[in-house]
Amino acid sequence: KPREAELFLIPETSKIGIQVYYQTSYFDIIFDQKDVAFIQDAFSKYLQDFDQKKLIRKKSQKTRRMYGAKGKCRVEWGTIKSMMNNYGDTNYHLGYEFKDNSPYFTIIVKDAKNIATDLGSNVSEKSVEIQLYFTKAQVKTLLDNFSRERLQTEYSALTGSDTYSSDEY
C-alpha cells in the first residue's frame, strides 16, 4: 500500500531521516552521513542495474540485500508524531524486489530493541521490521534530496552555518 514519507534534517548532529506511518505507528529512521553516502551509492548502483536490465526477477535474500546488508540506523517510534518516546539502534539492508512485474528499490530496516527503559511497564519491547519500497522516479527524487548540495542548503537555512558536517571525536 503506498505511503507518504517525509525527509528531515537534524542540524545538531547533521543526520537525516525518513518519517513514515507504518502499521499504526509513526517511525523516524535516522541515518548519519556515512550511511547517507552508503544509501546514495546503493541508489546509484540500482539505477545503473535498472537501466542496463540486470535486475533479477526472482525474489530472494540476494536481491533484497543486493546493495548492502551492513547499514546502521536509529529508529524512533510512537503512535503520535509528537510522542515518539521509543527508540533503538538497528541494522538495515538495501536491495530490490519485484511486485506485479515492477521493480522497487527497498530499504529493509530490521526491528530495533527499545532502549527507552525509563518509560514504565507498558512499553513496546521492540519496533517492527520496516520495509520501504521506492519506484525508479522516487529513487531519483531521494537521490536529489540526499545530495550533499541539497543537505548543505537545508543545513545553512536552519543554522546559518555554511559547514554541513558533524564533529568527530
PLM region descriptions:
Residues 1-169:
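Positively charged, low-complexity terminal tracts
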